[in-house]
Regions:
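N-terminal active-site segment of His-dependent metallophosphoesterases
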Residues: 5-53, 60-85, 100-152, 179-307
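Extended active-site neighborhood of metal-dependent phosphoesterases/phosphodiesterases
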Residues: 226-229, 307-458, 541, 554
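Beta-strand-turn-beta hairpins that frame and shape the catalytic cleft
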Residues: 230-243, 249, 415-434, 468-471, ...
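Active-site neighborhood of phospho(di)ester-bond hydrolases with catalytic His/Asp-centered motifs
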Residues: 243-245, 288-295, 320-327, 435, ...
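Active-site environment of divalent metal-dependent phosphoester hydrolases
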Residues: 250-253, 298-300, 327-335, 440-443, ...
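Conserved beta-sheet core of the metallophosphoesterase superfamily
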Residues: 313, 484-564
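Active-site-proximal segments of metal-dependent phosphoesterases and phosphodiesterases across multiple
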Residues: 439-452, 458, 465-515
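A short C-terminal boundary segment appended to hydrolase-like catalytic domains
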Residues: 560-592
Length: 592
């Protein structure tokens, strides 16, 4: 083909940089998002995610008062024995019927905490931390950085606690606690009273949570430090693990990635090369596991997951691969429109999780088990759980028709399956615990924030507590500590944070000597230690790491030793570069 030489269609154009702050212009990205933002859907989402749970939380005091008055009313003027029996019946009904109501109220309360309070706390904390780090007298050592950040957390927590108390006191002094009889008032009056009560409850809970975080910082011992390798030859590894992360697989041969745009690689050539390198390394010295810590795909589309599965179709090491989901796998609403808002009940959220669950099933469903929430013991295999009678049919209906029943079932399944556990076999020195650290997001600006749910933390504690003295590799997407360097941007600290990271650390650190945490997300090449817990942060296998290696993909081969009682340690890891000058498919073809 010949024609006027204008540009090469294979090498992208301006449209490939629409969602990239690096390949395009950040100001243009913000303006585009604001113009394409659906304010009607956002308003509906605000009512659903914030206002409705707040009403549910705030109406509890009024319902309690109304029910108490009802019980007292039926008892007055009656025979004492009849009154006692009536009160007993009403109390029994309150316990029987009120339990689901209380459960729903608590669910709404915690939803507000994770949707509103925790992100506000993280933002306040990181703003204060960044101010502290920018003060004269530059923080040079790891200890100084940790001390400055701890001070920033304490100040931020105290400020937020003061704000929460001030908000609650202001509402109480201005309006009083709204205890009304819900039988005799109009719905608007009840709603207004519930919202005012919710503000008081949230203000006080914010103060309590903030003071708790302050206390935890004051009580904490040990800083985040860079890891020091063992002297060469001191120990012999008994396990070799390939740690890849953030593959960002695209669904098009010449497709670019959202974050990098045309500055990054196109197509899936780098992923294919990384897998070939892993295979060559295994042929030289056998690998025990191949771990991928999230962002397997670039936007969680069906085509991207299909590409991933095609890459592994005949891959000899497929049965050694384990992965966890990242925010790009489950939280990208629209890869071409950063202003699009996703309603809580939309099919999109459920479908992205269904695709991820399907890939988990196909790759590791015959060895990963879910945790029984009641006993804390290991339950059925993932493949058996997903295939239980009726469940597979509902999920198939979701995939084919986007049914409401299928959406509800998928959300229940997602809450149920994590953490996944690949228990150590008798001959294995360690097992895997796979966490989902992605907060449920409805908009591009919040898609990268992380949360490990309370139910997951409870199950994680149970597995670590009930397991024999074996070592565990704990996989998640988000970082559990901030890196001990002062140059991290405020947007990264807030927008990429695991908002309840202290809770995750608290669950793991009692077993720190036999745990190794592996994660990705931040595209940073770092290995460290926090309170005796080993932490491995992986660069992106396609987009590299921050600094000189940006867009130069790489991964690690970790050499692990396991001692008595499951104590785990690392030997100097091997860093493998994926980047090559011609890493895109089609470079050998003449330009169009």
């Amino acid at each position: 083909m010949t024609g006027t030489r204008i540009f090469d269609l294979r090498r992208g154009d301006y449209d490939d940089n629409r969602t990239s702050p690096h390949g395009g212009n950040i100001r243009s990205l913000i303006v585009t998002a604001a113009l394409e933002f659906n304010y009607l859907k956002a308003s509906i989402g605000f009512v659903t995610l914030i206002v409705a749970p707040a009403i549910f939380v705030g109406i509890v005091p009024s319902l309690v008062v109304t029910y108490s008055r009802l019980k007292l009313g039926v008892a007055v003027g009656r025979n004492p024995m009849v009154a006692v029996l009536t009160l007993a019946v009403l109390a029994g009904l309150a316990i029987l019927l009120g339990r689901p109501f209380v459960s729903k109220a608590l669910e709404s309360f915690w939803r507000l905490q994770y949707t509103l309070v925790f992100p506000i706390f993280v933002a306040a904390r990181e703003v204060v931390r960044s101010i502290v780090e920018s003060l004269p007298g530059k923080l040079a050592t790891v200890e100084e950085i940790d001390r400055g950040r701890r001070f920033g957390t304490i100040i931020g927590g105290l400020l937020l606690a003061g704000g929460g108390i001030g908000l609650a006191v202001t509402v109480v002094l201005s309006y009083g606690l709204q205890l009304i009889n819900v039988e005799r008032v109009q719905p608007w009056v009840v709603t207004r009273a519930a919202l005012l009560n919710a503000v008081v409850i949230l203000g006080l809970s914010t103060a309590v949570e903030s003071l708790y975080w302050v206390w935890r910082e004051l009580a904490a011992r040990g800083s985040v430090e860079d890891w020091a390798p063992l002297p060469s030859g001191q120990e012999t590894p008994i396990a070799r693990v390939a740690h890849l992360s953030d593959l960002h697989i695209v669904g098009e041969r010449y497709g670019y990635r959202m974050e990098a745009g045309t500055r990054g690689p196109r197509g899936n050539g780098p992923v294919r090369k990384a897998l070939q390198q892993v295979l060559a390394i295994d042929e030289s010295t056998a690998l025990d596991r191949i771990i991928v810590t999230g962002d397997v795909t670039d936007a969680g589309t069906r085509a991207e997951w299909a590409e991933f599965l095609d890459l592994l179709q005949d891959y000899p090491l497929r049965d050694r691969i384990s992965f966890v989901p990242g925010n790009h796998d489950v939280n990208i609403v629209d890869r071409n429109n950063p202003g699009r808002f996703d309603l809580p009940w939309s099919a999109g959220q459920a479908l992205r999780r269904l695709r991820t669950a399907r890939a988990l099933d196909l790759i590791q469903g015959d060895r990963a088990r879910i945790v029984d929430r009641d006993s804390g013991n290991l339950g059925p295999l993932l493949k058996d759980y997903l295939g239980e009678s009726g469940r597979a049919d509902l999920l198939r209906e979701l995939a084919e028709d986007g049914t409401n029943a299928g959406r509800r079932e998928m959300m229940k399944v997602w809450e149920r399956i994590f953490p996944l556990v690949e228990a150590p076999k008798r001959s294995d020195p360690y097992g895997l615990i796979l966490l989902d650290s992605n907060a449920r997001s409805h908009f591009a600006l919040t898609n990268a924030i992380g949360v490990v749910s309370p139910s997951q933390l409870k199950a994680l504690k149970a597995v670590l507590r009930n397991s024999p003295p074996r070592a565990w590799l704990i996989l998640l997407h988000h970082a559990v500590v901030e890196y001990p360097v002062p140059s991290i941007s405020l947007t990264d600290r807030i927008g990429l944070a695991l908002v309840n990271a202290p809770d995750v650390l608290k669950a793991i650190t009692p077993h720190a000597s036999r745990c190794l945490v592996l994660h990705g997300h931040r595209h940073r090449d770092w290995i460290g230690v926090s309170r005796g817990l080993l932490l491995c942060s992986a660069p992106s296998a396609t987009l590299g790491s921050h600094g000189a290696d940006q867009y130069r993909g790489s991964f690690y081969i970790h050499k692990i030793t396991v001692g008595a009682g499951g104590s785990i340690s690392l030997i100097t890891p091997e860093r493998v570069s994926v980047f090559e000058a011609a890493d895109s498919i089609g470079d050998e073809v003449p330009p169009l």
